[in-house]
């Protein structure tokens, strides 16, 4: 019995360690670390790459994509930066913004369907901002070539609007640039009803000699966003190299010492991802390209994911056409899956961090999404998905609780052995093993079903944590955002007392419900005789209550509901096996005064 309990204690402690690590993301030191990092970066002085003298804003074919369009620190406001450049408006059902004609850059994108808070009157999410602002974030596609080509479009090229006055779902726009040798570069930009921009480039060579050039693309972000130090989700650089290639994930800190270069391949994509939003470029899929992730220092530190293609040649009097894609928006699962199929983008669904248990996590989301679409409430979808998972694992749970019932049935004999052998632990263990053998009981049989359920638990946890569908999704009553902590607090009587409480005392209704259900679940079993184990057994629900209070309400509701189902499941199975349910007896035992042993 003691060995079996030790397994459960080990599992519980492992979960505590994991959750304690996640809990650190609420620590105010995160902001201090961010400020310290910005100060460190601002002190570094490194000369940044500039366009070659005499060449229209490109570089040589052997050069790398541009690192930055300016050495100056970003001081302009977003409105000022937008107002001082020529632009073409973007207006769709999903996106508002504009294209900067300097560099044909996408640096002004706001997401109409998402607000900063649950209040619909709050500002909509700003994804992209111009490079000369503090939060500059943009994508850009251009060319690099030898100077004799006559110049190619790059970061400082001012394109001309040839057709269309506004980019919408039904009206593309065409930009053109003609260099000093008469080579014509044209770019037609179209957009779907969501977040995918299609770029069709054409290069016409009317001259008497062939020209050679390469293409580049980059996603550049000023500074480093504040990222909670949790292992649950990846935020930073990511990409797939090759049509059947593997995913590359790099954190911002991974590239601060030196750039990370991915081997040249044909096909794939690259970009930068946040928890809910992403910016990604899909280069032309027929030409090999090299991918690089880097940190650019100087007065304006920035992080960049870029690619550079192999050199391509356009003969005299000929032309070439290239097609690229830019994704800039919300990581909606059905939409990302559709883009992977519709545009043949390899492994584009990995834009969403499904984790190690992809084969469990994604089907779990599809089930939850089915319930969400049917009932229209993501909280209800969480509850129903948990029921289905519990039902699927009922046979395993039955074995687990049957083993526990058998152990309870053996409890009187165990007590007799304990009284017989006293403090002789070696003799006690030998007698226990003999008893297990006689009763044909495996003391660890109840642990394996639990261990098999752990990946499913983490998969469900992952779905709830990472998917944008839970963001600002209401439940019932006071829960208006399942992705935010329960806003109530026990320490001001859930809002009845007119004062705010410190963050660490924000113990809301749902964390309390979770703590109570966890307490009841643990009291379905007798308190361990070992004092240390008994103390852990007693305090764990309280510790979890405080820890999970700062977690998204959707996760806490899931945990409370899962505990409730587990209690019902355990009671049913133990009753079927003739084991006494000692929940209330165990609770009463907490308050009994233990007799003082005479010396």
Curated annotation (Swiss-Prot):
GO terms classed as biological process: protein insertion into membrane; protein transport
Family matches, as InterPro entries: Membr_insert_YidC (IPR019998), Membr_insert_YidC_N (IPR028053), YidC/ALB3/OXA1/COX18 (IPR001708), YidC/Oxa/ALB_C (IPR028055), YidC_ALB_C (IPR047196), YidC_periplasmic_sf (IPR038221)
Transmembrane stretches, start-end: 6-26, 378-398, 448-468, 501-521, 536-556
Predominant place of localization: membrane
Keywords, sorted A to Z: Cell inner membrane, Cell membrane, Chaperone, Membrane, Protein transport, Transmembrane, Transmembrane helix, Transport
GO CC term, one of those recorded: plasma membrane
Keyword Transferase: no
Pfam families: 60KD_IMP (PF02096), YidC_periplas (PF14849)
Topological category with respect to the lipid bilayer: Multi-pass membrane protein
GO MF annotation list: membrane insertase activity
Region (Disordered), start-end ranges: 35-78
Keyword Membrane included in the entry's annotation: yes
Subcellular location field: Cell inner membrane
Biased composition annotated in UniProt, kind: Low complexity: 41-76
Gene3D superfamilies: 2.70.98.90
Record HAMAP family: YidC_type1
Similarity-based family: Belongs to the OXA1/ALB3/YidC family. Type 1 subfamily.
Function, in words: Required for the insertion and/or proper folding and/or complex formation of integral membrane proteins into the membrane. Involved in integration of membrane proteins that insert both dependently and independently of the Sec translocase complex, as well as at least some lipoproteins. Aids folding of multispanning membrane proteins.
PANTHER family on file: CYTOCHROME C OXIDASE ASSEMBLY PROTEIN COX18, MITOCHONDRIAL, OXA1
Self-association state and partner proteins as the record states: Interacts with the Sec translocase complex via SecD. Specifically interacts with transmembrane segments of nascent integral membrane proteins during membrane integration.
Protein name per Swiss-Prot or TrEMBL: Membrane protein insertase YidC
């Amino acid at each position: 019995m003691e060995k079996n309990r030790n397994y459960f204690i080990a599992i519980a402690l492992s979960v505590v360690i994991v959750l304690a690590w996640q809990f650190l993301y609420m620590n105010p030191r995160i902001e201090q670390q961010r400020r310290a990092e910005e100060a460190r970066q601002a002190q570094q002085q490194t000369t940044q790459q500039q366009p070659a003298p005499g060449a229209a804003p490109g570089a040589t074919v052997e050069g790398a994509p541009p690192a930055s369009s300016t050495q100056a620190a970003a001081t302009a406001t977003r409105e000022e930066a937008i107002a001082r450049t020529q632009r073409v408006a973007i207006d769709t059902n999903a996106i508002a913004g504009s294209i900067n004609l300097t560099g044909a850059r996408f640096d002004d994108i706001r997401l109409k369907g998402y607000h900063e808070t649950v209040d619909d009157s709050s500002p909509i999410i700003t994804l992209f901002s111009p490079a000369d602002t503090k939060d500059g974030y943009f994508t850009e596609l251009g060319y690099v070539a030898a100077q004799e080509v006559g110049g190619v479009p790059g970061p400082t090229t001012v394109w001309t609007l040839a057709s269309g006055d506004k980019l919408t779902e039904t009206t593309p726009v065409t930009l053109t640039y003609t260099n000093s040798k008469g080579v014509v570069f044209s770019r037609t930009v179209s957009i779907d009803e969501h977040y995918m921009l299609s770029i069709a480039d054409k290069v016409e060579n009317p001259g008497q000699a062939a020209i050679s050039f390469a293409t580049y693309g980059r996603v550049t972000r000023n500074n480093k966003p504040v990222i909670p130090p949790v292992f649950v989700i990846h935020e930073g650089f990511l990409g797939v190299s090759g049509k059947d290639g593997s995913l590359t994930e790099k954190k911002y800190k991974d590239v601060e010492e030196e750039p990370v270069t991915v081997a040249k391949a044909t096909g794939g994509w690259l970009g930068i991802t946040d928890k809910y939003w992403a910016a990604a470029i899909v280069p032309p899929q027929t030409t090999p390209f090299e991918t690089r992730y880097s940190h650019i220092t100087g007065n304006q530190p920035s992080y960049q994911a870029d690619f550079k293609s192999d050199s391509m040649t356009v003969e005299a009097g000929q032309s070439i056409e290239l097609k690229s894609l830019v994704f800039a928006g919300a990581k909606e699962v059905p939409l990302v899956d559709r883009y992977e199929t519709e545009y043949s983008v390899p492994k584009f669904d990995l834009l969403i961090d499904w984790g190690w248990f992809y084969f469990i996590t994604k089907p779990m989301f599809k089930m939850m999404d089915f319930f969400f679409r049917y009932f229209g409430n993501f909280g209800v979808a969480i509850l129903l998905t948990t029921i289905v998972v519990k039902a699927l694992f009922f046979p395993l749970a039955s074995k687990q609780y049957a083993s526990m019932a058998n152990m309870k049935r053996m409890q009187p004999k165990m007590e007799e052995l304990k009284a017989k052998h006293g403090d002789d632990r070696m003799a006690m263990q030998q007698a226990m093993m003999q008893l297990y053998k006689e009763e044909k009981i495996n003391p660890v049989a109840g642990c394996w079903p639990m261990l098999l359920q752990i990946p499913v638990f983490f998969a469900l946890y992952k779905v709830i944590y990472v998917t944008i569908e839970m963001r600002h999704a209401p439940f019932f009553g006071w829960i208006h955002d399942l992705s935010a902590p329960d806003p109530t607090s026990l320490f001001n009587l859930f809002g009845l007392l007119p004062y705010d409480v410190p963050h660490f005392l924000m113990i809301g209704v749902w964390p309390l419900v979770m703590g109570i259900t966890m307490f009841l679940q643990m009291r379905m079993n007798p308190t361990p005789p070992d004092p240390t184990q008994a103390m852990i057994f007693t305090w764990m629900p309280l510790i979890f209550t405080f820890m999970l209070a700062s977690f998204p309400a959707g996760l806490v509701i899931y945990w409370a509901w899962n505990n409730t189902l587990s209690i019902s499941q355990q009671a049913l199975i133990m009753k079927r096996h003739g084991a006494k349910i000692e929940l209330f007896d165990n609770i009463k035992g907490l308050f009994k005064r233990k007799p003082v042993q005479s010396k």
